[in-house]
Regions:
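A conserved beta-strand element that flanks and buttresses the S-adenosyl-L-methionine
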Residues: 108
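Short catalytic micro-motifs in class I SAM-dependent methyltransferases
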Residues: 111-115
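Class I (Rossmann-like) S-adenosyl-L-methionine-dependent methyltransferase catalytic domain
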Residues: 1-45, 52-99, 116-123, 127, ...
């Protein structure tokens, strides 16, 4: 079994559930604000990769009446989404293994790229972009660094985490995407109002909104 497959398997078998238990059923405010910024309509479809227990999708569904889909590697989180939030289109799976029948108006990458190995990152990004309808949007919430490097994940030493300059990686290969917005924040969710060399780049996340123009 390859290292790439085993990392996915670790999340499906244990780490996905452990992540849900550590973080609980909270709304990801950074992602929700990005969705709100795009003002989805009732007929629009939203697909979140790494949706957790669906709290963010549920809030978007209630406030915008949009149709929502989601996947996550945590069985416990998806069961919560079905039982508590009454979401119908949520599934336990990895993104590369999941097959969607349709494309979406908004695709959200909910913080899973930093545990996506380098060898499958191009395939993953391509699939995300292909999941977005023309003239629609890709939202990415993830770690954001000026250089690429990897760490051992502190919760499981068998898992690697990857920090990258995602905007450069994405726009270099996909010039027909347009960067609408990028907002930096720290791990605690606090927005960065200034930037200097004293900031630990390992703690920086960003919300990036891309428009697919063709």
């Amino acid at each position: 079994m390859s290292k790439i497959i085993s990392q996915d398997k670790i999340f499906l078998e244990k780490e996905g559930d452990d992540y849900f238990e550590r973080n609980g059923p909270s709304v990801n405010q950074a992602i929700y604000k990005a969705i709100k910024f795009l003002r989805p309509k009732k007929k629009d479809t939203i697909f979140e990769i790494g949706c957790g227990c669906g709290s963010t999708l549920k809030k978007a569904q209630e406030n915008f009446k949009s149709q929502v889909w989601g996947i996550d590697t945590s069985k416990k989180a998806i069961n919560y989404a079905i039982r508590k939030h009454k979401l119908k289109h949520v599934f336990t799976d990895t993104f590369l293994n999941f097959t969607a029948k349709n494309k979406f108006n908004i695709v959200v990458s909910g913080g899973f790229l930093y545990v996506t190995p380098d060898k499958v990152l191009p395939k993953t990004i391509n699939k995300m972009i292909n999941s977005v309808k023309k003239d629609s949007y890709l939202v990415i919430w993830d770690y954001d660094t000026p250089v690429s490097y990897e760490n051992s994940w502190k919760y499981n030493n068998k898992v690697k985490s990857y920090k990258r300059n995602l905007v450069n990686i994405i726009l270099k290969k996909h010039p027909k995407l347009y960067l609408v917005s990028k907002i930096l924040s720290l791990k605690n969710g606090k927005k960065l109002d200034s930037y200097n060399n004293s900031i630990n780049i390992d703690n920086i996340l960003s919300v990036m909104i891309f428009r697919k123009i063709s």
